[in-house]
Amino acid sequence: IVFRAAQERSDIEIVAINDLLDADYMAYMLKYDSTHGRFNGTVEVKDGHLIVNGKKIRVTAERDPANLKWDEVGVDVVAEATGLFLTDETARKHITAGAKKVVLTGPSKDNTPMFVKGANFDKYEGQDIVSNASCTTNCLAPLAKVINDNFGIIEGLMTTVHATTATQKTVDGPSHKDWRGGRGASQNIIPSSTGAAKAVGKVLPELNGKLTGMAFRVPTPNVSVVDLTVRLEKAASYEEIKKAIKAASEGPMKGVLGYTEDDVVSTDFNGEVCTSVFDAKAGIALNDNFVKLV
C-alpha cells in the first residue's frame, strides 16, 4: 500500500525495498491485490530486482537493518513497515545504514514521537525517527482536534469497527495471548483492545486522559469506522458541529479530513485519500452536550 500510494506522487521516488520475500513474489503481490485491484503500471523482475514502470528498484533481503547500505542508493526516508523495529534503538539501524529519516508505519513501542497529519504536524522539529501512529489514530485525531478546538471535549469513548487484518485466523486457531482473537475472522464479530484513543493524547496533549476506546473486528476486507461519543464543554447543536467539521475539511484540514452527507457505506471509501472522513448523516446527538460522531 505504501508503494502504491507513493507511485501516485511525483515528489516521491522509490529506490529500494528490503523484504525477506523473493523479488518474483514481491512483483506478483504488487501486480495483484484482492482489495485494491491490479497495479496500474508495469512490473517486471530483472537480475533479482524490481523494474516498475521502467525504473529499477533495488531489492534486498537483510534481517538486520544495519546492513542495508541505504546510502548506496541515496535513500532519504525509510518507511519501516515490518512491525519489528518500533523503537528508536532498533529503527536507528536504518540511520546507521545511511538513511536520513525513518517513519514507523505503526505506533512506537517507546517514546519515539508520533505525528498525525491534521493533528500535530506543526510540532515536528526535525527528528530523524518518528511514528505515524495507527490507522485508527489517524482517523480519530483530526476529528477530535476539530471538536476540541471548537467546542471542548470533557471526555469521550471511541469504538472502532475494524476490518479484518492479516494477523487474524481464517478459522479458529491457537492464540494464547488473545483467546477471542484466535476465532475465525470471517465468522465472528470479535471484541478487541486498541490503544488508538489513548494515543490521541500523545499527539494532542490537551486530550491526554480524556479519551479511551475499544475495537470490534468484523468480517470485511477493508475500511474501518470510528464511532466517537463525547461530552462537550460548550453546548452545540448537531448542525453547528457539522458546520464546524465541514469548514475544517474545506480549510486547514483539506485533504486530511473529509466530509460527506451522502448515504455511503464502507466500500465507498476503498482507496480514500483522506485519512478521516466525517459521515454527517450517521451521527446523532442526545442533547447539545452529548454527541456521537462517525
UniProtKB/Swiss-Prot annotation:
GO MF term list: glyceraldehyde-3-phosphate dehydrogenase (NAD+) (phosphorylating) activity; NAD binding; NADP binding
Binding site for D-glyceraldehyde 3-phosphate: 134-136, 165, 194-195, 217
SUPFAM superfamilies in alphabetical order: Glyceraldehyde-3-phosphate dehydrogenase-like, C-terminal domain, NAD(P)-binding Rossmann-fold domains
Site feature location: Activates thiol group during catalysis: 162
Reactions listed under catalytic activity: D-glyceraldehyde 3-phosphate + phosphate + NAD(+) = (2R)-3-phospho-glyceroyl phosphate + NADH + H(+)
Any one of the GO BP annotations: glycolytic process
Region of interest: Disordered: 169-188
Keywords: Cytoplasm, Glycolysis, NAD, Nucleotide-binding, Oxidoreductase
Pathway it works in: Carbohydrate degradation; glycolysis; pyruvate from D-glyceraldehyde 3-phosphate: step 1/5
Xref: NCBIfam families: GAPDH-I, PRK15425.1
Role of this protein: Catalyzes the oxidative phosphorylation of glyceraldehyde 3-phosphate (G3P) to 1,3-bisphosphoglycerate (BPG) using the cofactor NAD. The first reaction step involves the formation of a hemiacetal intermediate between G3P and a cysteine residue, and this hemiacetal intermediate is then oxidized to a thioester, with concomitant reduction of NAD to NADH. The reduced NADH is then exchanged with the second NAD, and the thioester is attacked by a nucleophilic inorganic phosphate to produce BPG.
Family membership noted in the UniProt record: Belongs to the glyceraldehyde-3-phosphate dehydrogenase family.
Protein name: Glyceraldehyde-3-phosphate dehydrogenase
Species: Citrobacter freundii
Native organism taxonomy: Bacteria, Pseudomonadati, Pseudomonadota, Gammaproteobacteria, Enterobacterales
Gene transcribed to yield this protein: gap
